């Protein structure tokens, strides 16, 4: 994914640019970047739903030009938002490089929202258009630069067995960053409102979004972990079909195991598991594996503490949960302190 396939490969630009600059002993100055937009204030389609939880992440990654991996820390950010009330649930995923930290101010990011109501689901997504396939592509993109922004956008409505999808490539006067999410979401909604949607039938049993499918499998592993080791092992191989735009995918849980809580991990991260997933595109046959680590009990149950993804053979990306966790009001609190917000996965 599509969400992950969309969002994470852009970290390659920051990593490769950094590897090249270290040999020269110079780093270009990046313009100041404003603080992140608070999730509770973002004008997303699900803004009428109360924020239950907000969790933020730090992005790192590694590249392998030849035989050895080269790593770079703190080049980007991630954010997951849970919303919900009265039978409605929404997930928001924001991932990208931070132009203020990434070498040469590299700017690659994307945002996906899934807003599910009893009447149907809306999926809104936007990302920078660069999709580097090789290290050579990454270096060329980093050297060329671009003061204007170019983004792919999608607005899909899934209801009554039909996915109605509008897509568009949007250009902006300046290269909007991950901190400009609210601005870009407004532009995307306005632009796509005039694009005629294309209809695609959705077979019975197919879930209306990727994030919801991940949450469903995670919920299953949490229940299984509480039931015992045998129940957890039986979760392996479970698959959920979902639609994204006009295409069908299968999300498979290829492996899941209990792990030991790492030193320095939040005390709320109790009974953690490591789960391996694979996205399988039905049309092309392409496969995209990724790993999550998360607690199955306590205040962080169902919250990914580690996200790992390898979109290319030469690239690995990792997002680690920040030490603090955001409250429903958007302010950071200690991850080990009592929580009043409800985790929808618990």
Segments from the language model and where they lie:
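Bacterial N-terminal signal peptides that target proteins for export
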Residues: 1-10
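Short, aromatic- and cysteine-enriched interfacial helices/patches
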Residues: 6, 24, 66-70, 211, ...
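Bacterial N-terminal signal peptides
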Residues: 9-19
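Signal peptide processing junction and immediate N-terminal pro/mature segment
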Residues: 18-33
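Acidic, serine/threonine-rich low-complexity disordered tracts
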Residues: 30-170, 219-346
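Secondary-structure boundary elements
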Residues: 117-118, 175, 184, 194
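An internal, short helix-loop-strand segment that often contains or flanks glycine-aspartate motifs
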Residues: 163-165, 171-181, 185
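Hydrophobic, aromatic-enriched interface-forming segments
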Residues: 183-236
């Amino acid at each position: 994914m599509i969400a992950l396939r969309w969002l994470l490969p852009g970290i390659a630009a920051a990593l490769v640019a950094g590897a090249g600059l270290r040999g020269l002993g110079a780093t270009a100055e990046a313009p100041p970047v404003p603080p992140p937009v608070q999730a509770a204030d973002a004008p997303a389609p699900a803004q009428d739903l109360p924020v239950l939880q907000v969790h933020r992440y730090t992005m790192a990654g590694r590249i392998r030009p030849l035989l050895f991996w080269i790593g770079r820390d703190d080049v980007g950010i991630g954010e997951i938002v849970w919303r919900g009330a009265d039978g409605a649930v929404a997930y928001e995923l924001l991932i990208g490089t931070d132009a203020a930290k990434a070498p040469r101010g590299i700017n690659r990011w994307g945002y996906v929202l899934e807003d599910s109501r009893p009447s149907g689901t809306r999926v809104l997504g936007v990302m920078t258009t660069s999709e580097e396939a090789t290290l050579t592509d990454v270096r060329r993109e980093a050297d060329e630069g671009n003061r204007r922004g170019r983004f792919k956008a999608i607005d899909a409505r899934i209801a009554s067995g039909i996915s109605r999808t509008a897509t568009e490539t949007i250009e902006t006067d300046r290269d909007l960053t991950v901190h400009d999410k609210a601005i870009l979401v407004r532009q995307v909604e306005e632009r796509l409102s005039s694009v005629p949607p294309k209809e695609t039938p959705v077979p019975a049993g197919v879930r209306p979004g990727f994030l919801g499918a991940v949450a469903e499998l995670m919920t299953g592993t949490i229940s299984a972990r509480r039931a015992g080791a045998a129940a957890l092992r039986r979760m392996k191989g479970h698959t959920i079909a979902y639609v994204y735009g006009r295409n069908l995918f299968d999300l498979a849980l290829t492996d899941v195991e209990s792990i030991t809580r790492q030193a320095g991990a939040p005390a709320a991260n109790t009974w953690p598991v490591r789960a391996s997933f694979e996205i399988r595109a039905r049309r092309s046959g392409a496969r995209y594996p990724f790993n999550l680590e998360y607690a199955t009990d306590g205040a962080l149950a169902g919250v990914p503490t580690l996200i790992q993804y390898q979109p290319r053979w030469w690239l690995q990306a990792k997002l680690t949960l920040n030490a603090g966790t955001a409250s429903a009001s958007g302010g950071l609190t200690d991850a080990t302190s009592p929580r009043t917000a409800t985790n929808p996965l618990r």
